[in-house]
Every structure is written in structure tokens, then in C-alpha cells.
Amino acid sequence: MSTPVTRTQVPDGVRDRLPSEAAAMRRLSARLDNVFRAWGYREVSTPVIEYLEAVAAGAANWGRREDLYQFFDRKGRTLALRPDMTTPIARLMATRLADEPLPLRLSYFAPVFRHRELRAGATSEIWQAGVELVGAPGEAADAEVISLACAAVRAADLTGFRIGLGHVGVVEGLFESAGVDPQAAAVLKEAMVARDLVAFEQGVARAGLSGERAERLLALVHFHGSYAEAVARFGGVGGRVAEALQHLGRVLEVLEALGVAEQVNLDLGLVRSLGYYTGVVFEGYLPGIGAPVLGGGRYDNLVAEFGRPLAATGFALEVDRLLMAQEQQGALAAEPGLDAVIACPPGQEAAAMAWAARLRAQGLAVEVDFLDRTGEELAAYARARAAARVLRPGVPSIH
């Protein structure tokens, strides 16, 4: 049975933004855009609404179609609100950007939509800022996007940022070496995404794993350490695991040269909920925020879903979590006030508005009071609007 609603409510998982909140978001957007452009990333936008077949290219790997917002158009075709930006940009890369020289560096600032459990400040309308580096394989490209993620968080005047770094090949390789079947692997990955250690241990037991095979998998989900420790613990498995560890080592070498390695910790049990990742994966964290503020990684097979095989890597920042961190750390810039409020006595509307126009032409932010407030009432309104002064017709002031 549906829950009654009123016309003054908004749906679960979405919110209004008041002027100060919208201004804070716009300032953050400008800072991030400046950083992205300085690194050569150009902004693109894609439709909020896509055909289900298009977003399913990402969601199929994800296995979470029930989290999509789906509906029909007038021709009976199934549409969906985009659940992420990476999949639409992959479509764009394979179509309208097919003739662009590679690698392509693209950025975005946009909302995505997913049904999510509404806890810990989570919403279903998720504003993201991110980048995609397409057509560049290898550790240098992986290191660039990780380093850019660090630069973006610095641009937001936030401190204490850390990145957890993993690799799909380590997880998949350990599952293969332990003989985990695909169904059991899916259960284990779901537990890893949720960071549910109890569910993971139960999944290992149900899969019939014991001895060294079980110990390695349990060590995987608990591992947070240095590269040397990772090689010592898992390097002997060989195969995909050894290859993935070698790649991580080369990425860390580049990050060391870029001066950001101290912000990066190996988190080999890291699994991202979006299942199109094929190599390096990472998440970013800030003190006092109980969920990742950033996630990303390499997805070398996704663009091929749209007919154009291309290596790619990128990340997405969760804007509202960054804003929450800015508020906690006192990094939110004060909202700019007005330069003046102009009093507007009856019959002087045209003169007051013309005066305001002249001041705006000088670059000032000016508001005309149409409610005929006077004295302390007008002064109180000006204070509420953070106006530097009150101007009255016939009283000399700024011109």
C-alpha cells in the first residue's frame, strides 16, 4: 500500500537546496572545474534520461537493475534515469567523439539517480563531479587520475584526505586460485562492497573453503598495508594476482614521484559496487564522513559495449559529502552579500530601479526594496541580506 503524500513534500531521496546551499555547491563546482581544466579535462554533459539498453551496459556488469529509476516513453520504449556518468560518457566516446584524437580527457558536474538505502546522509539524487581519461592504458594514466583526485580535494580546502587503492586482478585471481565458483564469488563480492566481514566469512564457509584457501581470502578483506607487505602475503599466488600486484607497484612508483603516495594506502579487499572495473580501483575518505567521498578505477571493457574497444579510467566525487566535509572543517566560504539595498518610496520605483541599473553596470550587487520599508525595518532587512549599505533616494552615496 502506498504512503499518502502531500503536494508540499518531495520524494524520498531528493532534496531542495536553499540559496546558501546552492551557492556553496556552485562555488565548489567552480573550484573543481578550474582544477580539471588545468589538467586538460574538458567538460561534457549527457541527458539525464537514457534508453535502458544504454545504461544497462553498465548496470549489467553491476547486477543491480532494481536500483534504476525506470519508466516508459509514449512509444513504449523503456527509459531510465542515468545511474552513473561513466556509462553515458562511454556511449559518447563510441559515437559523437569517435573521431577525436586520443587520449580524451573529459569532466562533468551532474546528478545521477539510484535507489539507495537512505541512511548516513545518502540520497537517491547524487550530485557528482568527476573525470574520465579515455584511450590511455597503463600505470601512468591510473596514477594521473589518482593524483588529480587528490588535487581536487585540496582545491576544496579539505584536509585529511586518504585513498584506499586496490586491484580487481587481486580479488579475481585469489578467487580463481581458491576455486570459488561464479555464484559464490558474486555473494562474496556483495559482502565486500558492503564491508560486511561477517557475511564474507559466512560466504567463505558456505563455499566449502578451508585451510590456506580460506585464510588467504580472509586475509584479503582485512588487508590494509604497504606494498611490500602485500607482495609478501599474496605474491606467491602467482598468475593474475602477481600481475596485479606488479601493476600496483608501478602505479605507486609514479604516485611517489608526483608527491601524493603518502595519501594512498593499499586496500586489497576493495570492491566497487559498479562492476565494470577491470584493473585499479580506489576510494577516497575524509575524517568525519562515514562513507567514501570519491570512487573510481579502470574500466577497459565498458566503451567496447558501445562498439569501440578503448582503455579508460576515471573517478567521481560525491559533491554533497564534500560539502558536508567543508562544513565540518570550516572550509565553506561565506556567501557573498549585496553591496547595497536601495529604498524605494512609493512613486520613485523608476528612479530607484534606474539607480540600481547604474550601480550594477559598475559591477555592484544591488537590490531594490519594493515593500516600502523604512528606518530600522529596512536596516534589518539589509542585515539579513548581508548588504554593505542602505541607499535612499536623495541621500548622496555611491554612484
Curated annotation (Swiss-Prot):
Top-level taxon in the UniProt lineage: Bacteria
Record's keyword terms, sorted: Amino-acid biosynthesis, Cytoplasm, Histidine biosynthesis
Presence of the UniProt keyword Amino-acid biosynthesis in the record: yes
Family statement: Belongs to the class-II aminoacyl-tRNA synthetase family. HisZ subfamily.
Xref: PANTHER family: HISTIDINE--TRNA LIGASE, MITOCHONDRIAL-RELATED (PTHR43707:SF1), HISTIDYL-TRNA SYNTHETASE (PTHR43707)
GO biological process, one term: L-histidine biosynthetic process
Function as written in the Swiss-Prot or TrEMBL entry: Required for the first step of histidine biosynthesis. May allow the feedback regulation of ATP phosphoribosyltransferase activity by histidine.
Assembly and oligomerization: Heteromultimer composed of HisG and HisZ subunits.
Further remarks about this protein from its record: This function is generally fulfilled by the C-terminal part of HisG, which is missing in some bacteria such as this one.
SUPFAM superfamilies named in the record: Class II aaRS and biotin synthetases
GO cellular component: cytoplasm
One GO MF term attached to the UniProt entry: histidine-tRNA ligase activity
InterPro entries on file: aa-tRNA-synth_II, aa-tRNA-synth_II/BPL/LPL, HisRS-like_core, HisRS/HisZ, HisZ
Pathway recorded for this protein: Amino-acid biosynthesis; L-histidine biosynthesis; L-histidine from 5-phospho-alpha-D-ribose 1-diphosphate: step 1/9
Name by which UniProt lists this protein: ATP phosphoribosyltransferase regulatory subunit
Subcellular location: Cytoplasm
